[in-house]
Amino acid sequence: MKWKDIKNVRGLRSIGTIGSSNIIGTAITSVFWIFIAGLIGTDSYGELSYFLAIIGISSVIASVGGGYTMQVYTAKGVKIAPSLYFLGIIASTIAAIVLFVIFENFGVSISVIGIVAFNLILFEILGKKLYKKYFKIFVAQKILFVILSFAFYFVFGTIEGILVGYGVSMLLFSQIIYKSFKNNKVNFSLIRERIKFLSHNYIAELSATARNNVDKLIIAPLLGFSFLGNYFLGLQVLALMLIIPGIVFKYTLPEDSSGESTGKIKILTIIVSFFIMLLGIFVAPLVIPIVLPEYATAINLIPILSLVVIPRTIYVMITSSFLGQENSKYVVIGNIITFGVLVTSIFPLAELFEITGVAIAYVIAFSSSTTYMIAKYLQLRNKNQ
């Protein structure tokens, strides 16, 4: 692909707007997480990641499949936002109460409500293709997250304060939900007419979240919070490497939903991700000992975890195509494959290689599901030709 062809790829300007917000926002939060890692130590850092996994799973359960459903149907011009907001508020409030009874941690509860509300807001904005507004809100939330988390951490003196700041930083944008209720009425018939896609999408989100968090829930009782802290740091580095695929996905999903061509930008994303993977393998292990010497175990994990960058990038690009066509069942199957392979391989590999075995299981799991997604995508494309 020549440079003049790259410049003419449709959507690069919009991706640049989304991308700059994600890069700035991720840079802000990554510096925060790295600083916190050194401040609270490996055990507390592992405990924090354990609670974040619980929050992540609970928030997806409470979102009732509203995330990508919001983005896809908003892009199609359907006034479904108030109904999804209403369901999300009720479900997340119930989840927050249950979690407080179990853990007696206010930060966990408020974070669940905040994530559900804020994610729905972002998905609505992306569905409307208001990329500049997305930039402002996304970056502002990250700045507030850092400021409030530090403030509440020193007030509470525990990681609960960090989680309180996390939740409050997202709830501060709830006036957008109020405006949505004011402009359009709740209409559950819009949901009933699309219940099949909603339910499939709900299962897809649940399976994806279980896939992304089950490893942390297993590591904590199996190897302890100290090992989990090192593993979580490795995942933070991986998250940095996956910024660009995530950016492109946020652009391509509404475009795929509208029937626009996104093939060139997806191929370009995979090429760029290859070079990012090389940085993770060869550069990151040299930097971590200098910045966080107490996280020595993470040095061995990062090169292994970096190998998953290409499979995950391909997976995300194909997921955009499937969801844009309202065909989420293959995404669900892919997530189930990842979950199943990860759970079945993590125990024997962890027993043999401890935390390094968990990283190996992670790579095997995502490579397996990506292989399935590629095969299914090619099968459907050949069938439609």
Question: Predicted regions span which residues?
Answer:
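Alpha-helical transmembrane segments of multi-pass membrane transport and lipid-handling proteins
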Residues: 23, 27-30, 62-63, 68, ...
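Alpha-helical transmembrane segments of multi-pass membrane transporters/permeases
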Residues: 15-25, 78, 82, 125-150, ...
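Transmembrane helical elements of multi-pass membrane transporters/channels
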Residues: 17-29, 141, 159-177, 181-254, ...
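Hydrophobic transmembrane helix module of multi-pass membrane transport proteins
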Residues: 86-203, 307, 311-316, 320, ...
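Signature of the first transmembrane helix
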Residues: 7-64, 199-226, 342-347, 362, ...
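Helix-loop junctions and terminal segments of transmembrane helices
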Residues: 29, 33, 59-78, 238-260, ...
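Interfacial transmembrane-helix starts/ends
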Residues: 11-12, 49, 75-90, 195, ...
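Alpha-helical transmembrane segments of multi-pass membrane transporters
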Residues: 27-35, 92-99, 139-158, 172-176, ...
